[in-house]
């Protein structure tokens, strides 16, 4: 006689850490839809020359896959330093650069080294939602304070809370995700003057910003400032999973204490180096995306939506009567955007022109419904 199959265990059946119970994993919806504007990728695919270079580079590396990779990724860090020197105008050496599997691993290593039990991290919300998740995962106390009306950073309020709470880690995202504003070097200097620990300036969208990179301040604040970046956004290398940081060499020495051995594969290293060799071609799309972002913003404003001025490759817009319902209405029309959890607002990545047109047509239809702001109008669709 066949016994009944045992029920599959659930999380409740496992000896999970108590602080993880009831939590949900991070992640944007992955759905097969005609228009995907929800994860802020560069919509322009790699050039054939870049594809060929990656294939050749990986093929050459494959003969040594029986060996561990360069654990310190010196060649890749040298190429990243050369790129940053050209892009920011600040001379950077490989000893100032560290790389990992996406900027999230970089952030995790930073919190492992400078956060932890008995230590505190502060963020100004709404901002990148992985900052509190990584803080929780490293047992760093997370403290958040609201941004100003309009979602900008109130630097005076930020200085006050940092001076009062004396955190070990401060997060500033510039341009800020999901709201889009950059922070000036003058404002960062004011904050750095009072930060007791380290200030992490998250420049994931730095190539889109109208403000200079904070890497120019590292020499002035070597023990307080670290700048994190990624190749997942402007660099159109999201599938390659490569993040990096710029800091004084001593800070990188600290990360060597917590990094996993051989954390960055040979394949990732050579593929990223190939992408860097084609940086000029890839980043040529940045100006196009900025122009499209401005076109989309103007059209949305013309329909009556409130559009938050953006310095990145996305726009935050509202004010919807019911943002989750509006998100579903976009999805029903084949357009996937992001509900970032801000009441009344949704975020849309800047895509290719035809993708943006499809998004604007869907927006015009929603502007004529009871989900839209009171002042919204369908006028202005392409």
Curated annotation (Swiss-Prot):
Cofactor(s) demanded: pyridoxal 5'-phosphate
EC number(s) stated in the UniProt entry for this protein: 2.6.1.9
GO terms of biological process kind: L-histidine biosynthetic process
Pathway stated in the Swiss-Prot or TrEMBL entry: Amino-acid biosynthesis; L-histidine biosynthesis; L-histidine from 5-phospho-alpha-D-ribose 1-diphosphate: step 7/9
Pfam families: Aminotran_1_2
Modified residues (N6-(pyridoxal phosphate)lysine): 233
Skewed-composition ranges (Basic and acidic residues): 9-22
Substrates-to-products reaction catalysed: L-histidinol phosphate + 2-oxoglutarate = 3-(imidazol-4-yl)-2-oxopropyl phosphate + L-glutamate
Keywords of this entry: Amino-acid biosynthesis, Aminotransferase, Histidine biosynthesis, Pyridoxal phosphate, Transferase
Transferase among keywords: yes
Region (Disordered), start-end ranges: 1-28
GO function terms (MF aspect): histidinol-phosphate transaminase activity; pyridoxal phosphate binding
PROSITE patterns attached to this UniProt entry: AA_TRANSFER_CLASS_2 (PS00599)
CDD domains, alphabetized: AAT_like
InterPro entries (alphabetical): Aminotrans_II_pyridoxalP_BS, Aminotransferase_I/II_large, HisP_aminotrans, PyrdxlP-dep_Trfase, PyrdxlP-dep_Trfase_major, PyrdxlP-dep_Trfase_small
Tagged with keyword Amino-acid biosynthesis: yes
Subunit annotation: Homodimer.
Family affiliation: Belongs to the class-II pyridoxal-phosphate-dependent aminotransferase family. Histidinol-phosphate aminotransferase subfamily.
Identification of the protein by name: Histidinol-phosphate aminotransferase
């Amino acid at each position: 006689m066949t016994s009944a199959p045992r029920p599959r265990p659930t999380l409740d059946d496992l000896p999970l850490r108590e602080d993880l119970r009831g939590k949900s994993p991070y992640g944007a919806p992955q759905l097969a839809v005609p228009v995907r504007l929800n994860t802020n990728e560069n919509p322009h695919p790699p050039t054939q020359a870049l594809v060929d270079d990656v294939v050749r580079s990986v093929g050459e590396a494959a003969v040594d896959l029986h060996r561990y990779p360069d654990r310190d990724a010196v060649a890749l860090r040298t190429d990243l330093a050369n790129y940053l020197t050209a892009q920011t105008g600040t001379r950077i050496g490989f000893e100032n650069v560290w790389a990992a599997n996406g900027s999230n691993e970089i952030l995790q290593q930073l919190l492992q080294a400078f956060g932890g039990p008995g230590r505190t991290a502060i963020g100004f919300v709404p901002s990148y939602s992985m900052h509190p998740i990584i803080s929780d995962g490293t047992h760093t106390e997370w403290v958040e304070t609201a941004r100003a009306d309009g979602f900008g950073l109130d630097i005076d309020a930020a200085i006050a809370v940092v001076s009062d709470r004396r955190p070990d880690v401060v997060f500033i995202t510039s341009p800020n995700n999901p709201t889009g504003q950059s922070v000036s070097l003058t404002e960062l200097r004011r904050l750095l003057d009072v930060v007791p620990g380290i200030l992490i300036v998250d420049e994931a969208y730095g190539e889109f910003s109208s403000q200079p990179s904070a890497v120019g301040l590292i020499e002035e604040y070597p023990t307080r400032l670290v700048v994190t970046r990624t190749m997942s956004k402007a660099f159109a290398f999201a599938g390659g999973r490569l993040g990096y940081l710029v800091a004084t060499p001593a800070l990188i020495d600290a990360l060597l204490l917590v990094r996993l051995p051989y954390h960055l594969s040979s394949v990732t290293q050579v593929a990223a180096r190939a992408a860097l060799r084609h940086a000029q071609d890839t980043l040529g799309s940045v100006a196009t995306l900025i122009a499209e972002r401005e076109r989309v913003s103007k059209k949305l404003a013309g329909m009556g939506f409130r559009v938050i001025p953006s310095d990145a490759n996305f726009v935050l817009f509202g004010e919807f009567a019911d943002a989750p319902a509006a998100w579903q209405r976009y999805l029903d029309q084949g357009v996937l955007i992001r509900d970032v959890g801000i009441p009344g607002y949704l975020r849309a990545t800047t895509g290719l022109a035809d993708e943006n047109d499809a998004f604007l047509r869907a927006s015009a239809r929603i502007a004529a419904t009871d989900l839209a702001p009171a002042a919204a109008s369908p006028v202005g669709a392409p």
